[in-house]
Amino acid sequence: VNTSDLPVDDASAPQYAISATANLQERRTRTLKHGDTFAVFDQRGDIGGEPGNSEGLYHRDTRILSQFQLLLEEARPLLLSSMTQDDNAVFSADLSNPDLLAGGQIALRREQIHLHRLKFVWEGTCYERVLARNFGNAPLGVRLTFRFAADFADLFEVRGERRKAHGEAFATLESGHAVVLRYLGLDQIERVTRLAFEPAPTTLTTARAAYEVRLKPGETRRIFLRYGVADGSVEWTGRGFYRQMRAARHALRMTSARAASVDSSNSVFNEIVRRSVSDLYMLITDTPSGSYPYAGTPWFSTPFGRDGIITALMTLWIDPTIAKGVLHFLAATQATAIEPVRDAEPGKILHEMRYGEMANLREVPFGRYYGSVDATPLFVLLLGEYFVRTGDLDTVRALWPNAEAALRWIDAYGDRDGDGFVEYYRQTNEGLANQGWKDSHDAVFHSDGRTAEGPIALCEVQAYVYGAKRHGALLAGALGHHGA
C-alpha cells in the first residue's frame, strides 16, 4: 500500500468520545443484562428520566425505556437497601414510605408501608414484582403509581452525540393492562416497547399506571410488571414471572458451570472468584455464530474484536469454549473487501459492531467497523493458543482459511509503508484516529506533547504479529501444510 495514496488525517474529526455530561458516577447504579438487552437502574430500581440521565432499558443499542419510576402517593419512597444478587441475575430493593402530608399535617408517618421490588432481565424484557405490605396497626389506603416513557435514543446519543433529526414516536393503550410505545426510525426500522401490568391498574394511560391499594394490618399486595421488546410470546401473570426467573437463573448457572472450579482456604478470595465468574458470564452473549463476551455495560455491551480475544486468552485455562465462540464469531464477520468507510480490508478482523439507528444510517461508522490494528494478529494468536490448550484440530481445520486471510492482511495491508512494521492509518476522517488499545484521539503523542500523525506503529502490535506468525506456523504444521 502506497502511503502517498492515503487521505489526509484531520485530527479535528469527531472521535465519538463519551460526553462529559453522560455521567454514571454521581448516581450509584445497578445493572442487569441478558443477551442483547441490559438495564441500568438507580438504587431504588427506578429509571430516572431526567435530561442527561444515562439510566434506561436498552436493547441492541437503543434505549427502549428512558423512564420507569415507582411513586407512593406521588412521592419517591425511601430507600432502605438494594443489591444485585451474587449471580447477577436478580436485583432487589427494599423501600418504605416517607412522611405523607395532607392539609399540612402528617397523614401517614414514615415506614408504615414496606415495598419490595424484585427485577430480572430475560429474553429482551425486564420482569418486575412489587410487594406492598402494611406494617401499621390500622387499615391503609394508598396510591402506587408507575410513571414511564421511552425516548428510543440511540446509545451514542445517550453518550453525548447530537443528532439533527429523529423518527416518529407513537403510544397506544392495549386493553386495560398494557401500553405499547412505538418508534419508527429514520432507518425505517420500527422499535416497539410493550409494558404490561398484572392485575390491571385502577387507571392506565400511555404515560402512567396507578393502583389504589387498600391494605389491612399485616396484609400484602403483589403487582407484576413486564416491560421490554414487544413479542407477546410469554404470559403476563405472576406464574409467568416465577417461571421466567427460574429460567434466567438456570441459564446463567448452566453457562457459568463450564468454568473450572477454583477454591482456596481463604473465604474472601473465594468470594472474589465467585463474583468474577458471575460478572464474566453475565457479559457472555449468544450470537448466531457462537457465544461472545461483550465488552461491558453500559456503553460497550456489544462485540469488540480486541476485547473478546483478550478475554478469551485470559480465560482459556478455565473455559476454552469462550475462545471457540470468539473465534467462530470473528471468522464469520471477517472483512472480505476494501471498504474505506469501515476501515475494512480483506482478512481484517472486526473492531466493533453496532445495531442502532445511528449506525444503520452511518451517522457513526460502527455498524460493522474494522478500525483495529491488533485484532487481526491476535485472532491468529488466539487460534494457536486454543489449539495448544484443547488439541481441537477440527476447529483449527474449519478456521484455517480465516487464519490464512488474517496472515495475508498482515503482509499486504498491515505494513503500509514496507518498513517491516505493522502500523495503522484510518482511511476516512470518520474513523478512529488511533486504532490500538488506546484509541482516544490524543492517546499517542510525542515527548513534547504533539499528537502523533499516522501511519503509527505500536510496539505491542509487532509482538502480536510475531506471535501470530509463530502460531500460524504451528497450525500449518498440525494440518500437514509443511513448508507453508
Language model regions located:
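Beta-strand-rich N-terminal accessory domains
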Residues: 1-104, 122, 228, 270-273, ...
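Acidic/polar, glycine-enriched structural segments that form the non-catalytic walls/loops
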Residues: 3-15, 114, 122-127, 134-303, ...
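Proline/serine/threonine-rich low-complexity linkers at boundaries of modular beta-sandwich domains
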Residues: 106-109
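Active-site-adjacent structural elements in folded domains
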Residues: 112-115, 208, 291-299, 362-366, ...
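Long, charged, mostly alpha-helical binding arms that flank functional sites
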Residues: 257, 432-434, 440-461
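Active-site-adjacent bridging/hinge elements
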Residues: 279-294, 298-299, 347-359, 433-447
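Aromatic-rich carbohydrate-recognition surfaces in CAZymes
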Residues: 301-433, 458-462, 466
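Active-site neighborhood of glycoside hydrolase catalytic domains
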Residues: 460-484
